[in-house]
């Protein structure tokens, strides 16, 4: 699979230019998935996706060329050759590269492509939101801060606080927009806009606990969001449920699917012991240690907004009886291969939260 190959290349890249090559390969390999349906909406979404990501890539490439034109090839090893650059040059290059990466990470104001990409099928949406594309941008931000500039240089240039502010704005804005959506996939899309910026926030705070929180969220958000998209896809495929109002009685019709969806949603809110609580806990500790106590308000506000747009879905599904006339002729959860992926990732979300901190736990 070309997408998996590109994502693996991004993770294993040892230099900026190698990272960029795989970064672009990921864009080109995911575009056909966005336009897969071939209808007008999908084509428009694909066009928007390319425009946004290509503009971001141009900014990133310009920053890389500027950097390497002065210092030579830049390895991911906090290159001391960066000391040759002036403070202004370092700041502008940082803005170009982080801004370019921020497009793929769907940070405000470069997030517009992500909700439109919901025209793609649910498995593709899961790939875009939980596994590959937005995570490539967020991962790139972390690597650029820590492995190219280094946290000492970022702190010296006072570049962390502005990035933390942008990430915080994105977190709250994405949650507010999610609250306005009636389409389930669009609600999940704006939720991703919010949640992925936790990773950039952790990197910008430049402390050990905040960094752990951001990197842990890279994994945890992926598990929870892919669970939500798998479950949403099953609901749409089996029952035709695509909007919030149609969720009435879904828990009685498809209890296993809704169990998986509920675990993912509660994890996004930050309810222990699901995975999302762990990453938010580390981010909160890191914020206090770094003197960014205002970040606690951002985390608390985001969690409350997450509850505001997820709990009504769960209430409709579990506590409101389905209208008999709305029952489709088909019944049950559907084939095992439809529900099993959501259950597996839901259990993984629960397991990594329960066993976080254990000796054998990678998180």
Predicted feature locations:
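Hydrophobic transmembrane alpha-helices and their helix-loop junctions in integral membrane proteins
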Residues: 2-19, 28-281, 285-317
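Short phosphate-coordinating micro-motif centered on Lys-Gly-acidic
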Residues: 24
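Cytoplasmic/organellar membrane-interface segments at the starts of transmembrane helices
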Residues: 244, 251-258, 310-363
């Amino acid at each position: 699979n070309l997408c998996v190959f590109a994502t693996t290349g991004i993770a294993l890249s040892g230099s900026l230019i190698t990272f960029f090559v795989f970064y672009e390969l990921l864009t080109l390999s995911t575009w056909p998935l966005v336009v897969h349906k071939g209808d007008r909406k999908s084509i428009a979404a694909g066009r928007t996706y390319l425009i946004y990501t290509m503009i971001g890539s141009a900014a990133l490439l310009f920053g890389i060329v500027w950097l390497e034109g002065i210092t030579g090839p830049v390895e991911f090893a906090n290159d001391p050759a960066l000391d040759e650059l002036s403070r202004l040059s370092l700041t502008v290059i940082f803005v170009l590269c982080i801004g370019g990466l921020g497009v793929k990470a769907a940070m405000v104001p470069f997030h517009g492509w992500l909700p439109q990409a919901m025209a793609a099928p649910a498995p593709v949406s899961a790939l875009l939101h939980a596994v590959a594309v937005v995570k490539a941008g967020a991962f790139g931000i972390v690597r650029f801060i820590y492995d190219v500039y280094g946290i000492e240089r970022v702190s010296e240039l006072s570049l962390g606080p502005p990035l933390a502010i942008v990430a915080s704005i994105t977190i709250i804005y994405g949650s507010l927009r999610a609250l306005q959506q009636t389409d389930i996939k669009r609600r999940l899309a704006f939720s991703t806009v919010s949640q992925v910026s936790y990773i950039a926030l952790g990197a910008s705070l430049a402390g050990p606990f905040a960094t752990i929180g951001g990197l842990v969220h890279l994994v945890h958000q992926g598990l929870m969001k892919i669970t939500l998209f798998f479950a949403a896809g099953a609901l749409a495929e089996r029952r035709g449920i695509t909007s919030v109002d149609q969720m009435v009685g879904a828990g009685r019709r498809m209890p296993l699917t809704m169990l998986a969806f509920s675990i993912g949603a509660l994890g996004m809110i930050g309810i222990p012991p699901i995975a999302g609580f762990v990453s938010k806990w580390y981010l909160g500790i890191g914020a206090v240690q770094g003197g960014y106590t205002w970040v606690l308000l951002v985390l608390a506000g985001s969690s409350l907004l997450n509850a505001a747009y997820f709990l009504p879905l769960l209430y409709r599904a579990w506590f409101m009886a389905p209208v008999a006339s709305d029952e489709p002729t088909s019944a049950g959860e559907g084939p095992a291969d439809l529900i099993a992926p959501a259950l597996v990732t839901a259990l993984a979300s629960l397991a990594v939260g329960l066993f976080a901190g254990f000796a054998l736990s990678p998180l």
